[in-house]
Amino acid sequence: MLKRGRGRPGKRRRRVSIETSTCFRPACVKLGAGAGANLRQLASSRRPLRSWWVLYTIIMAAAGAPDGMEEPGMDTEAEAVATEAPARPLNCVEAEAAVGAAAEDSCDARGNLQPAPAQPPGDPAAQASVSNGEDAGGGVGKELVDLKIIWNKTKHDVKVPLDSTGSELKQKIHSITGLPPAMQKVMYKGLVPEDKTLREIKVTSGAKIMVVGSTINDVLAVNTPKDAAQQDAKAEENKKEPLCRQKQHRKVLDKGKPEDVMPSVKGAQERLPTVPLSGMYNKSGGKVRLTFKLEQDQLWIGTKERTEKLPMGSIKNVVSEPIEGHEDYHMMAFQLGPTEASYYWVYWVPTQYVDAIKDTVLGKWQYF
């Protein structure tokens, strides 16, 4: 007799194992064709479903069904279950092999990477990647000062760095007016030294900078001799006796030094003092003083009777000569007109101020 399985009631077994079916092979042989003939009768009988499946399995085994054959409809269900089942976790050996394979893939990927070609120095793309922070600096970050440049009765408002030198200021004026730096006379409380900064000479914002000078064409027009005869005349004048020996000058020099004459420093050159130059004689022997009004570009010649205010641009020439026996003092003349008769003579000028007077009145470009 076949024993009923121990499964829970109502739960159908999916398959019958090969071992179960082969156990009944001897019985199936005895049954033979009789069991097959009665198969239709078994299907229509009221036996339990489990018994029917057991008998079916026995008959199929007896008929020579290969071991491991499963019931119809079971493969699809098993495949669905296998598909839904989670992946089995890897053991240590498989995990180590997977890590090694990943490392090889990473090395291959790195080997395929090629460095980007270097851009040539002149490549515009390489130049575009460079930051153009300043220039600079050019004036970025420098303290600027507002100045009013006055030249030829024209005002120019400019901004320059406070730490720029007098030489750099002349270059700035040259870019504005066209005056070459060598022909500029830049004044702010006296001549502006080229080697000092605007900060050092205490230039403040809004200051007025006076510029005196002529263009190259103007200088050539004034100083170019009209003919060779004029050059010969100048050469003859140089061969004449010293001015201090001429009668018109001798009568003034014979009076001696004024009692209030300014002290002199032989062999030295100094800037003009901030006070007027005094203690000098004019051609009539009267006391005279010279005041240089740089802000107004004027020279004031003061006597006891009156003060003449002369624009510096109207002075054609300045000549000087040391006084014999007193070489630390000069006699000096300012040419106010077209001829020598218009010379205004001044005597006993301290030698250290002679060059400063010529530079202030004529500018450094003068050739005398």
Curated annotation (Swiss-Prot):
InterPro entries: UBFD1, Ubiquitin-like_dom, Ubiquitin-like_domsf, Ubiquitin_CS. Gene3D superfamilies: Phosphatidylinositol 3-kinase Catalytic Subunit, Chain A, domain 1. This is Ubiquitin domain-containing protein UBFD1. Residues 233-244, 251-260 have a biased composition (Basic and acidic residues). Pfam families: PH_UBFD1_C, ubiquitin. It comes from Mus musculus. Residues 106-139, 231-263 are annotated as: Disordered. PANTHER family: UBIQUITIN DOMAIN-CONTAINING PROTEIN UBFD1. Residues 143-218 form the Ubiquitin-like domain. The gene is Ubfd1.
